[in-house]
């Protein structure tokens, strides 16, 4: 185990962390703001990647392809929202149904189980090759970092508007929101569309970065997103109180997740166990507040 090998691999881990961080922000919107466990993510990841790759293979501009991937993700969120609000299906089951449907959709989009794209033949925005020894205009880490900052700024502005505040109120207290005349069903659909749109954008970047799209590339994505959210909150929660900084904490959580993942691989731990380790990490951080309240909080004495 040479330390130089680990150092060489760290920039790639940071790049992946930034890309998946955009997806994690989407998960944050549903999980923390709307208080919905949305499992559509596992299918949307592949849908966005498939749309982006196929459009670029058809000769479309990279920005147009990424926009199409984002819109495809928003349509997936719309489907989940309709299942949940219009048809009365529980949110978690609605996400599973959409995810299941997207598997067939993704196969139809790509025509087969996977599609590759060559960085030498196509003008990709990001790539695994463009991490080191590149100018800032081509450096993957710099480009994705700028995109993350812009997205956080846009989301910070949006959730400060009247519509954004009503969306946050819907997740915080839906009954009170309805009493104030807020259309909570519409807000849930909108939140799911924004969330999955971000997932679609993230997957478009991921497909370019790794050079292919695959129907199984989204498996376990929700665990990665939750891990980024939970790690970011656990480490930076006491420091980052502002909404924009909380979104930034999610990005940092994603980067830390991939840095730890890279260290685990460098240490020679069986990679087949990585998904299980990720699930255990998420379970631990989700359970910690409960354990803290139940086992470590001193009982109040004499009504004090």
Regions found by a protein language model. Name each.
Residues 199-203, 209-275:
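Transmembrane alpha-helical segments in multi-pass inner-membrane proteins
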Residues 76, 137-218, 222:
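Helix-loop-helix "hairpin" substructures at the membrane interface of multi-pass membrane proteins
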Residues 60-100, 105, 148-149, 252-253, ...:
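Alpha-helical transmembrane segments within multi-pass membrane transporters and channels
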Residues 91, 95, 99-160, 190, ...:
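Transmembrane helix-bundle core of multi-pass membrane transporters
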Residues 172-179, 183-186, 245-248, 260-304:
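Cytosolic-side transmembrane-helix boundaries in multi-pass membrane proteins
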Residues 31-86, 134, 239, 266:
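Membrane-embedded helix boundary and interhelical linker motif in transport proteins
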Residues 1-23, 59-64, 132-138:
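Membrane-interfacial amphipathic/re-entrant helices at transmembrane-helix boundaries
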Residues 16, 92, 119-121, 140-145, ...:
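Loop-to-transmembrane alpha-helix initiation sites
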């Amino acid at each position: 185990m040479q330390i130089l090998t680990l150092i060489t691999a760290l920039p790639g881990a940071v790049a992946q962390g930034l890309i998946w961080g955009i997806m994690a922000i989407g998960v944050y919107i549903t999980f923390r703001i709307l208080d919905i466990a949305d499992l559509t993510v596992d299918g949307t990841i592949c849908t966005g990647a498939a749309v982006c790759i196929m459009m670029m293979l058809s000769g479309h501009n990279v920005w147009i392809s990424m926009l199409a991937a984002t819109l495809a993700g928003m349509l997936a969120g719309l489907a989940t929202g309709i299942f949940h609000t219009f048809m009365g299906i529980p949110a978690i089951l609605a996400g599973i149904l959409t995810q299941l449907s997207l598997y067939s959709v993704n196969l139809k989009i790509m025509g087969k189980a996977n599609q590759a794209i060559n960085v030498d033949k196509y003008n990709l925005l990001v790539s695994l090759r463009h991490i080191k020894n590149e100018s800032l205009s081509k450096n993957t880490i710099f480009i994705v970092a700028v995109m993350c900052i812009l997205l956080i700024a846009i989301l910070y502005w949006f959730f400060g508007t009247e519509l954004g505040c009503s969306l946050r109120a819907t997740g915080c207290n839906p009954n009170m929101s309805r009493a104030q005349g807020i259309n909570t069903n519409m807000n849930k659909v909108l939140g799911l569309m924004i969330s999955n749109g971000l997932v679609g954008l993230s997957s478009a970047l991921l497909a370019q970065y790794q050079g292919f799209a695959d129907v199984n590339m989204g498996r376990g994505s929700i665990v990665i997103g939750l891990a980024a959210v939970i790690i970011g909150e656990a480490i930076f929660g006491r420091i980052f109180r502002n909404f924009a900084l909380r979104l930034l904490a999610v990005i940092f959580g994603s980067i830390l997740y991939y840095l730890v993942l890279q260290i685990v691989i460098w240490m020679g731990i069986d990679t087949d166990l990585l998904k299980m380790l990720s699930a255990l990490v998420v379970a631990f951080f989700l359970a910690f507040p409960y354990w803290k309240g139940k086992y470590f909080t001193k009982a109040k004495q004499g009504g004090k």
